[in-house]
Amino acid sequence: MDTEPDFSIVTPSYNYASYVRECIESVKNQEGATFEHIIQDAGSTDGTLDILNSYPHLKLHVEKDSGMSEGINRGFRKARGKWVMWLNTDDRLLPGALAAVKAFADSRPDADIVHGAWTFIGPDGALQRPMKALPYSLNMHIWYGTYLASTALFLRRSTTIEEGFL
């Protein structure tokens, strides 16, 4: 019997052959947490599917969709992890990311959302600009809005289901 993984990483995909391998490797090499990696591909025609099929650990689903949000929601519906997040094909997780989120989430059983820092990556793959996660403040949210990068946003799956996905 399969046990519930700590995380379900959902990656919407469509014609991103030049980036998808780095995305997959960044998830595959995570340590300190259990995970499943669900790829929702909308029918890529640029070689992306050949790359995806070379990774037997992926849960690959190839289905036409009406856009990225539909692909993400389909992936969320298939997810079994305690926490879900989506990682676009041109994004990647830094080493130790899932272990750090797991440690924090385990220390805060009341949390339904965990958000952390992230770094912009240039077209050449170089890390460019680190962005820090700021403590939540209602005042800051009202006056400046709150930007939550999907690559650093983890949602409790049970809450995501109750609230109706994206």
Which sequence ranges carry the predicted segments?
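N-proximal low-complexity "stem/linker" segments adjacent to membrane-targeting elements
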Residues: 1-26
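Conserved nucleotide-sugar donor-binding catalytic segment
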Residues: 10, 130-166
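Short, acidic, metal-binding catalytic loop of nucleotide-sugar glycosyltransferases
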Residues: 25-34
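A conserved acidic beta->alpha catalytic loop
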Residues: 26, 41-50, 88
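Short beta-strand/loop segment that forms part of the nucleotide-sugar
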Residues: 34-43, 61-64
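Glycine-rich, basic loop-to-helix element that forms the pyrophosphate-binding segment
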Residues: 63-79
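Short aromatic/hydrophobic "clamp" motif used to bind/position activated sugar donors
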Residues: 84
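Conserved donor NDP-sugar-binding/catalytic core segment of glycosyltransferases
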Residues: 96-128
